[in-house]
């Protein structure tokens, strides 16, 4: 027989508030909840549930709701609350209203017509009813606040309810909800209580519901074994403590003195008495309660604390004297107790000095010692201790911990106890930093308790209240429970089966304790008997089902494949587990919803059950039990078993019958995550990351590889036609040389090819003569060459590369004239004819060069020289070589100018030599014979072979190119002395003068030489463009099935063009956020003028501006913090949100380290309450999350001053900063967007004179100083619970004269669960009928969707961009005649231009003129969008968790890398800078060694593993062998307390990440990271999208292997309306229900706001339905739509930014995108358009959070300040430490904004145009604002702010939660931490915190530089 544990047999309970709401809709209910906002939550949601009746017009069955309050001041408060959360019009009525309501019934009717809900005082309502202005039957809901007043016989509540009951017999009456605080007083006799509850129920005609957190604890918590231990009284006076009287006397006298002193004037002095009183009070209390030993220890701690306060401040003398007095008292007490106490070193020695309660406590703990359990208790398996000890006061908790730690160190038998303590903050100021510090510490301690690192927790009541703690097996209430709440809460902590709940009580309190406990237990029974969870019974009324075998009732479910078996008895637990694994936010606990249906069979009642799973589960329909069961419990189990069966068939449970939850997904994601930690140094590289690099072969274009020319066979001649499009920059031509355009030369270079070569676009190269456009032109006629000619050509070709270009100096290349060379074309000089552009090979020239090539330079014989006659013609356009110098490495010069006035006899510029003649004789022993020759002014031939970018200007030249001015006629051979000249001689005067007679003239002319220098760059580019052309053809054939891929003869590609330095100045490419900010300052006319000028760039050529992100040094904003460092040294600056007084919280036995977390006075005296002290180090870092000002600003005061304390007393700088902020009207945000509402707060009046300001300032200072000292309150002795329970004593409200009618009223309290089930279902049915009548049925179907005028009137932005996006300046030129070709989708022309493909394959590492980054951004966004669209439409019943997982897998870098590698993309990628000498293989050359490095061994294996993971196979976990290689050498890694810490090394100055670990062959291989391949795939998507449009791009993505919807695939979108509730009798049930929801939540109103009318209204309802709203079974929740909408918004916004006329560089684009596409922005917009009023949810936590957020947004006027911390750029919501639950922005609000976008997209038939119109209407202001005042990434900003002084020093991964904490160090001594889901987010958070602090310091400095002292 199976006995089932009670907690496994019931479904997880719903939130008690939801439970209450459910009852309140179905029957009249009185709800009793504490003062929190729990009550209002239920009231507002009840009103929403009745929305259908309330919104219907009164003449069509509509009704009204009344919220009745006691006092006038509550009317407005409740009305505002209802208005924030609903779209009801709320009227307010009380005695003072002058609404004319009383004048006539017509007036009253008009008022009722205008308002749906009326908040009214009781008396007014009664009067209106009595005067027949209102009828009770016209109301649908009647809510009474503080309904216990109905017990008073004369109270209006009572009178209204009397009328109500009279009507009830024959008219429909409204639903009544009574709200009251707790009715259970701490000290009320149970019998009395019962009687009073019945009276109230009768008066209100309602049932009191007792569901609350307390009752759910009692009901669902395990029942522990309760024990009371009676101990001897502790009489401290009788212990014979030496010096006892003296000690007591010191206490009394000091306290008396402090209390009676009149020294401190309340308005003028800093009063230190609070901390002094606390120190005395706590020490004395410890002395009285725990004895002298504990008091001795406490006195030591206080002595230290007071000492700190004394040291910490510059305090007035009087204050100091007082503090010193207190410190002396502590020292005296310590000294008096020390002699005896110091001796104690064992528990026995301690025994006489402590109460028996403490000794008993240790005896109980000892029973958990494993050895004790084995030996004395004879237990086989030891039970591990997991205990909580509750005490009332914080300092008792602290002293008890000290005692435990010492006893543990004295007594080995207590070694197994690992204690710690948690206390709550004092409850006064929860925002203060010390409570945040405490909160953080509390989180940490509880986490360690969860993981059993701590097994004994000493706690104050903070833990009694809802802080989630794991189940314990021992709870000790050290101080007896004094009220019901304390009893139930503490008992509820003992949740483990067989746990013990122990109360220790002294003899004197025994009687009181006994009677209290009896009462508590009685009351608990009463409450439980009244709290029926009808559909989820724990005990069954009918019979105890444990008597028989449950599992025999129904066959177990068995999975054939694995043999996994599920029995009936365990099914419920599995359903609970499954629900908890569904995706939901932190506020929502998803639980199943079940209903029990009694059925009569042959006079016997049996039970059926139906189960509804949460609405985001794929199973949306109700799971119904076919065969009834004998009792309710078995019915529940059976329906759960059926549900599990269906879940398994749906694939929601795996074959082992376990939920496929987040864990398994997370495991898989680990392999493919977007490498969150990839930038963290020292973490092993994953597949797809930027860290993992591999080697790939470089590819040569097919056309160039197959172009080998054979003798006597026809071949093509290709000419390189150079045409200058811009003169050389003046900076690059300082001597103002004149250059001719190569286009006008009569000769040029080309090459021979056996095969025809495809057309490629022209491209630029940057020569000495200027910027050239290179065209590859084929000669009209083919040619043949003979074998002899071919040999000569090969020699010429070899000569160019070896001698002229010096390519073979390193000996790594050899010439290969056969077809073996990878690139085998031959270079030839060509003659060209201008008229018909025909080209012929200039063989004469070839022969001439070949004849002279061996012996250059030729040294002439002496007699030849004597004959030498100078002929100027020979030297024009010549290259000369001095033959008298180093012949091994000849130097070549261009002859720039012939100087006729210079002769060899001219004066030599250097003082050492008279003339040139003398110089040559002395230096070279050479005599110059021709004395009449002119000298030559020459320039160096450039050795720069990378001409793809213009030469960098203004850099000091290398030593060999500049001559020393003293010998400016001779080129320097030695570099040593030329260096000084660089700086002293202006460029233009540096001339190099040579003597013609001593030169040899090279056969190659200067102009051709120039072109030869360009050949490596030209060939390199031609090869690239041919490769990308091959890719274009492949895509046309394979993706589009095209046959024609060649360009027609009359068509050519547009030129490759990219912004170079000069052009960037001419056009707007926004590279830096700062630049954008500056640009925005310029007037718009300026911009327009500039744009007009840009359009006129010469040659009519449009420039293609892909922002080349130029990492030039960012300007540092100097913040020199070091000047103040001495002030900060006092404390450890580990600024992580803890205040200075709280140390690290790891208490050890050394007293020095004890953190006495009573209160941190130090911080309080240094800093203000809600401002930021300039130097209060850690205090400043506390994240408030919302700009500067915490509290609401005082209404009337124009000066929200804060008092800022600093180490020198008051911080006047900051004060002045504040004054500035208030008085300077210019700081008010200029209203940039017209949509922002005007501020409702009027600006402060200008104050007259500065003196007045100062007067006021002084008064304020004093006043606030006083307030601050008052706020230094230490917590009370008894720590108050955070949530004070208000209780109502019903006796106070009853009258003596009982009204007669009460006697006759039957009690409303149902007798059995069955009766209650019946009552509830009748209530629900009635409401439904009235709803259906009230709902208008004429809006069932709509024909079309439409965009409303409000959205069209926006400067309508269509989302269809021209096919060739302006952002890429369309690249396909057709012949000029054909201006524009229409862009219908089928017309993809010839695909994407090779230029664009090349850009998409060029990484930023290549330092080329273009890079893929911009395209990658848009491609990434489109990829996410297309994948999301596909998944949404194919995985129709998967919830958002699975969709997100599938998307992550698809768009992960790891998957893109894998696909890219399969397509051969790596061989096409340009990943490194072009270096002609080292890494380029010239035509007809092969490497001398054929070495080829392999990839690392495991690369292949890792790739295969990822392949399997992405295909969804299960991966065996391999044990990782730690080799020490997977982590960088300098990184230290350690794991302690479940936190893995990686400390990053200090970065060395030089570090090159790109260096391959192994040598490889640079000529044939390149080293590329996996991420670069993924990026290139995204960029290719981007460039196709921009050129061809979305549909063709989807085809390309499909070819790549990505899963996307094809245009021609018709994706059937099923209707969003789910029809599970339709029945044959009511075929339109679901439509009617949808209709009701539509009315109830007023979606027509919402449509007007957003400017779009839905055709399929179910989409909109779904978009607003939260997972917690179980009632909506007709559309499901918004999670899937949110998943879709997120991607739609991301793509649309990214595309919009991309197309902006200010071409944003990739970095700016990414920053703007992150700033606009994030939860905070979306949530703010949702609130701006009042989405929360239509939000369909039942989730208390979320409800309160939304309320806070709405308030915050309205205070800000819905102004999106992107630089406020809340809007700072981060990719996802990051988490502040210890505040996971405190994320200020309710994610659900952002989610519904996204789901609305998804809904519009689907409803409009997946039309982005329509969607963008509506979204742009809503977002326009925000987008424009963001571009006008762009935010920047916090990490980037921090690096620029403190460039050299920022270091991210360590990363900690909290193993349990997987969260990451990162520490950043700024200026060496300030540390900030950030926390997040992964390294990237955590790093951003840390940077944010650091920035926040630095900005504050900077601001204070800037605003008050002159103020340094008060």
Swiss-Prot record:
Listed InterPro entries: Dicer_dimer_sf, Dicer_dimerisation_dom, DICER_DSRM, Dicer_PBD, Dicer_platform, dsRBD_dom, Helicase/UvrB_N, Helicase_ATP-bd
Coiled-coil spans in chain: 1245-1280
Stretches assigned to the Dicer dsRNA-binding fold domain: 571-667
Annotated residues for binding of ATP: 33-40
Residue ranges of domain PAZ in the record: 845-1003
Region (Disordered): 951-988, 1227-1248, 1272-1309
Short name of one Pfam family: Dicer_dimer
Site (Cleavage): 1537-1538
Keyword terms, alphabetized: Apoptosis, ATP-binding, Coiled coil, Endonuclease, Helicase, Hydrolase, Magnesium, Manganese, Metal-binding, Nuclease, Nucleotide-binding, Repeat, RNA-binding, RNA-mediated gene silencing
Subunit and partners: Component of the ERI/DICER complex at least composed of dcr-1, rrf-3 and eri-1. Interacts with pir-1.
Family according to the record: Belongs to the helicase family. Dicer subfamily.
Function of the protein: Component of the ERI/DICER complex which is involved in processing amplified double-stranded RNA (dsRNA) intermediates during small-RNA-mediated gene-silencing or RNA interference (RNAi). Involved in cleaving dsRNA in the RNAi pathway. It produces 21 to 23 bp dsRNAs (siRNAs) which target the selective destruction of homologous RNAs. Seems to process the precursor of the small temporal RNA let-7 which is involved in developmental timing. Required for avoidance behavior induced by small RNAs derived from pathogenic bacteria such as P.aeruginosa.
Other observations noted: The avoidance behavior is transgenerationally inherited, and thus progeny display this same aversion despite never been exposed to this pathogenic bacteria.
Name by which UniProt lists this protein: Endoribonuclease dcr-1
Annotated source species: Caenorhabditis elegans
């Amino acid at each position: 027989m199976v006995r089932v544990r009670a907690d496994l047999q019931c479904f997880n309970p719903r939130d008690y508030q939801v439970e209450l709401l459910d009852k309140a809709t179905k029957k009249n209910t009185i709800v009793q909840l504490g003062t929190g906002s729990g009550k209002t939550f239920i009231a507002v949601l009840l009103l929403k549930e009745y929305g259908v009746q309330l919104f219907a017009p009164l003449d069509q069955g509509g009704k009204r709701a009344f919220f009745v309050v006691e006092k006038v001041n509550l009317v407005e408060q409740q009305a505002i609350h209802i208005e924030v959360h609903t779209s009801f019009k709320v009227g307010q009525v009380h005695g003072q209203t002058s609404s004319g309501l009383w004048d006539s019934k017509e007036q009253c009717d008009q008022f009722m017509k205008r308002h749906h809900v009326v908040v009214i005082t009781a008396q007014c309502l009664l009067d209106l009813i009595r005067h027949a202005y209102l009828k009770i039957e016209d109301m649908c809901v009647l809510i009474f606040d503080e309904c216990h007043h109905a017990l008073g016989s004369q109270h209006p509540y009572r009178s209204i309810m009397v009328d109500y009951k009279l009507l009830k017999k024959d008219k429909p009456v409204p639903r009544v909800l009574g709200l009251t605080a707790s009715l259970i007083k701490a000290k009320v006799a149970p019998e009395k209580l019962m009687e009073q509850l019945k009276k109230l129920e009768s008066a209100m005609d309602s049932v009191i519901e007792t569901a609350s957190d307390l009752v759910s604890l009692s009901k669902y918590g395990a029942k522990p074994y309760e024990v009371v231990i009676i101990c001897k009284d502790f009489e401290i006076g009788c212990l014979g403590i030496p010096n006892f009287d003296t000690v007591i006397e010191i206490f009394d006298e000091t306290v008396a003195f402090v209390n009676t002193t009149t020294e401190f004037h309340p308005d003028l002095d800093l009063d230190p008495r609070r901390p002094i009183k606390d120190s005395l009070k706590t020490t004395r209390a410890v002395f009285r309660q725990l004895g002298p030993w504990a008091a001795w220890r406490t006195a030591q701690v206080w002595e230290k604390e007071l000492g700190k306060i004394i040291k910490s401040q510059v305090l007035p003398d009087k204050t100091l004297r007082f503090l010193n007095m207190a410190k002396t008292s502590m020292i005296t007490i310590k000294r008096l107790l020390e002699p005896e106490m110091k001796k104690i070193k064992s528990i026995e020695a301690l025994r006489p000095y402590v109460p028996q309660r403490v000794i008993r406590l240790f005896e109980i703990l000892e029973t958990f010692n494993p050895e004790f359990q084995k030996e004395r208790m004879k237990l086989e398996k030891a039970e591990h201790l997991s205990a909580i000890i509750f005490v009332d006061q914080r300092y008792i908790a602290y002293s008890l911990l000290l005692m435990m730690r010492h006893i543990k160190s004295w007594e080995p038998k207590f070694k197994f106890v690992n204690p710690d303590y948690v206390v709550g903050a004092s409850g006064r100021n929860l925002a203060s930093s010390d409570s945040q510090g405490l909160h953080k510490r509390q989180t940490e301690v509880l986490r360690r308790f969860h993981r059993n690192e701590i097994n004994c927790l000493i706690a104050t009541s903070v833990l009694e209240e809802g802080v989630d703690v794991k189940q314990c097996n021992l709870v000790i209430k050290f101080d007896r429970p004094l009220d019901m709440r304390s009893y139930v809460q503490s008992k509820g902590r003992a949740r483990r089966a067989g746990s013990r709940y122990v109360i220790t009580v002294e003899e004197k309190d025994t009687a009181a304790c006994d009677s209290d406990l009896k009462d508590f237990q009685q009351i608990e029974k009463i409450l439980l008997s009244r709290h029926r969870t009808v559909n989820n019974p724990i005990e069954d009324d009918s019979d105890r089902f444990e008597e028989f075998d449950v599992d025999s009732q129904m066959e177990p479910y068995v999975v054939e494949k694995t043999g996994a078996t599920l029995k009936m008895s365990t099914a419920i637990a599995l359903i609970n587990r499954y629900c908890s694994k569904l995706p939901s936010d932190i506020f929502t606990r998803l639980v199943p919803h079940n209903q029990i249906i009694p059925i009569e069979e042959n006079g016997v009642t049996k039970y059926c059950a139906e189960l509804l799973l949460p609405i985001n589960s794929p199973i949306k329909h109700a799971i119904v039990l076919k065969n009834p069961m004998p009792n309710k419990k078995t019915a529940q189990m059976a329906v759960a078993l059926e549900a599990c069966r269906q879940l398994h068939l749906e694939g929601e449970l795996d074959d082992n019958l376990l939920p496929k939850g987040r864990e398994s997904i997370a495991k898989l994601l680990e392999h493919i995550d977007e490498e969150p930690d990839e930038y963290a140094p020292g973490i092993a590289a994953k597949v797809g990351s930027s860290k993992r690099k591999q080697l790939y072969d470089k590819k040569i274009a097919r056309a160039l590889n197959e172009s080998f020319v054979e003798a006597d066979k026809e071949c093509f001649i290709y000419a390189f036609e150079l045409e200058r499009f811009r003169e050389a920059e003046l900076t690059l031509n300082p001597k103002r040389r004149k250059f001719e355009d190569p286009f006008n030369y009569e000769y040029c270079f080309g090459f021979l090819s056996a095969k025809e070569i495809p057309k490629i676009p022209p491209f630029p190269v940057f020569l000495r003569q200027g910027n050239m456009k290179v065209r590859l032109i084929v000669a009209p006629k083919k040619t043949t060459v003979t074998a002899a000619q071919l040999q000569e050509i090969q020699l010429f070709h070899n000569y160019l590369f070896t001698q002229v270009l010096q390519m073979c100096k390193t000996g790594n290349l050899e010439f290969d004239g056969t077809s073996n060379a990878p690139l085998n074309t031959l270079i030839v000089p060509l003659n060209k004819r201008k008229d018909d552009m025909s080209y012929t090979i200039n063989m004469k020239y070839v022969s001439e060069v070949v004849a002279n090539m061996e012996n250059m330079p030729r040294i002439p014989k002496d007699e030849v020289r004597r004959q030498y006659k100078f002929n100027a013609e020979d030297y024009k356009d010549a290259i000369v070589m001095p033959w008298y110098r180093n012949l091994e490495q000849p130097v070549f010069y261009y002859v720039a100018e012939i100087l006729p006035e210079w002769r060899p006899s001219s004066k030599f510029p250097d003082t050492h030599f008279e003339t040139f003649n003398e110089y040559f004789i002395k230096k070279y022993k050479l005599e110059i014979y021709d004395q009449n020759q002119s000298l030559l002014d020459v320039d160096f031939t450039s050795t720069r072979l990378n001409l793809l970018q213009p030469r960098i200007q203004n850099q000091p030249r290398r030593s060999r190119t500049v001559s020393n001015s003293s010998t400016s006629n001779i080129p320097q051979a030695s570099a040593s002395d030329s260096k000084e000249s660089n700086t002293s001689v202006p460029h233009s005067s540096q001339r190099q003068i040579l003597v013609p007679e001593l030169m040899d003239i090279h056969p190659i002319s200067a102009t051709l030489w120039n072109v030869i220098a360009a050949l490596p760059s030209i060939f390199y580019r031609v090869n690239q463009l041919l490769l990308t052309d091959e890719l274009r053809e492949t895509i046309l054939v394979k993706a589009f099935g095209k046959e024609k891929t060649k360009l027609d003869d009359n068509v050519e590609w547009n030129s490759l063009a990219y912004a170079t330095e000069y052009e960037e100045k001419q056009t707007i490419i926004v590279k830096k956020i700062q630049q954008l900010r500056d640009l925005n300052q310029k007037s718009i006319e300026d911009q327009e003028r500039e744009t007009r000028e840009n359009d006129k760039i010469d040659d009519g050529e449009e420039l293609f501006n892909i922002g080349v992100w130029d990492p030039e040094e960012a300007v540092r904003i100097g913040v020199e913090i070091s000047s103040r460092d001495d002030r900060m040294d006092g404390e450890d600056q580990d600024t992580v949100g803890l205040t200075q007084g709280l140390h690290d919280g790891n208490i050890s036995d050394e007293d020095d380290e004890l953190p006495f977390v009573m209160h941190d006075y130090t911080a309080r005296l240094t800093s203000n309450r809600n401002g930021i002290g300039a130097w209060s180090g850690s205090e400043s870092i506390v994240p408030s999350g919302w700009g500067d000002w915490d509290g609401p600003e005082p209404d009337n005061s124009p000066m929200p001053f804060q008092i800022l304390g600093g180490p020198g007393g008051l911080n006047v700088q900051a004060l002045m900063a504040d004054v500035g902020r208030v008085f300077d009207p210019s700081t008010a945000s200029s209203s940039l967007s017209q949509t922002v509402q005007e501020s409702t707060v009027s600006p402060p009046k200008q104050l007259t004179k500065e003196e007045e300001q100062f007067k006021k300032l002084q008064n304020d200072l004093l006043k606030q100083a006083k307030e601050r000292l008052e706020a230094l309150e230490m917590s009370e002795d008894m720590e108050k619970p955070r949530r004070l329970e208000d209780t109502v004593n019903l006796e106070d409200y009853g009258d003596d004269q009982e009204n007669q009618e009460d006697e006759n009223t039957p009690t409303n309290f149902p007798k059995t669960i069955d009766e209650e089930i019946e009552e509830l279902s009748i209530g629900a049915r009635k409401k439904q009928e009235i709803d259906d009548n009230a709902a208008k049925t004429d809006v069932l179907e709509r024909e079309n969707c439409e965009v409303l005028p409000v959205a069209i009137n926006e400067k309508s932005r269509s989302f269809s961009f021209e096919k060739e996006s302006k952002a890429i300046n369309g690249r396909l030129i057709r012949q000029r005649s054909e201006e524009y070709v229409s862009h219908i989708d089928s017309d993809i022309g010839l695909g994407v231009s090779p230029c664009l493909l090349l850009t998409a394959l060029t990484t930023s590492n290549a330092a080329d003129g273009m890079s893929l980054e911009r395209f990658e951004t848009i491609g990434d966004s489109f990829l996410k969008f297309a994948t999301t669209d596909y998944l949404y439409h194919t995985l129709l019943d998967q919830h958002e968790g699975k969709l997100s997982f599938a998307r992550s897998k698809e768009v992960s870098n790891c998957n893109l890398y894998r696909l890219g590698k399969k397509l051969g993309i790596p061989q096409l990628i340009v990943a490194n800078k072009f270096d002609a000498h080292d890494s380029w293989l010239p035509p007809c050359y092969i490497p001398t060694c054929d070495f080829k490095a392999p990839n690392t061994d495991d690369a292949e294996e890792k790739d295969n593993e990822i392949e399997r993971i992405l295909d969804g196979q299960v991966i065996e976990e391999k044990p990782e062998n730690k080799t020490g290689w997977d982590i960088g050498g300098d990184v230290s890694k350690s794991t302690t307390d479940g936190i893995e810490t990686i400390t990053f090394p200090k970065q060395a100055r030089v570090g090159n990440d790109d260096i391959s670990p192994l040598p490889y062959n640079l000529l044939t291989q390149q080293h590329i990271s996996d991420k670069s391949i993924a990026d290139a795939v995204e960029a290719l998507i981007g460039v196709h999208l921009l050129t061809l449009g979305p549909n063709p791009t989807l085809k390309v993505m499909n070819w790549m292997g990505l899963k996307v919807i094809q245009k021609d695939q018709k994706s059937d979108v099923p209707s969003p309306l789910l029809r599970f509730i339709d029945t044959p009798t009511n075929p339109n049930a679901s439509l009617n229900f949808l209709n009701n929801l539509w009315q109830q939540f007023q979606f027509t109103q919402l449509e007007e706001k957003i400017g779009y009318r839905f055709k399929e209204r179910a989409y909109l309802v779904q978009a607003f339905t939260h997972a917690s709203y179980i009632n909506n079974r007709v559309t499901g929740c918004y999670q899937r739509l949110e998943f879709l909408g997120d991607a739609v918004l991301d793509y649309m916004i990214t595309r919009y930014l991309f197309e902006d006329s200010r071409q944003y560089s990739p970095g700016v684009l990414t920053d703007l995108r992150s700033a606009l596409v994030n939860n905070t922005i979306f949530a703010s917009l949702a609130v701006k358009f009042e989405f929360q009023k239509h939000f369909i949810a039942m989730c208390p936590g979320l409800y309160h959070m939304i309320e806070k957020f709405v308030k915050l947004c309205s205070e800000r006027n819905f102004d999106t300040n992107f630089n406020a911390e809340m809007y700072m750029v981060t990719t996802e919501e990051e988490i502040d430490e210890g505040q996971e639950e405190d994320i200020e922005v309710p994610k659900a609000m952002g989610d519904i904004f996204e789901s609305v976008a998804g809904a519009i997209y689907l409803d409009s038939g997946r039309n982005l145009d329509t969607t963008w119109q509506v979204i742009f209407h809503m977002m326009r202001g925000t987008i424009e604002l963001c571009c006008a005042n762009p935010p920047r990434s916090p990490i980037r900003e921090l690096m620029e702010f403190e460039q050299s002084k920022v270091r991210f020093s360590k990363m900690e991964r909290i193993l349990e939660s997987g969260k990451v904490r990162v520490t950043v160090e700024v200026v060496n001594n300030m540390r900030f931490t950030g926390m997040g889901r992964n390294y990237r987010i955590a790093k951003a958070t840390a940077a944010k915190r650091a920035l926040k602090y630095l900005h504050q310091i900077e601001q204070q400095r800037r605003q008050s530089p002159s103020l340094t002292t008060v």
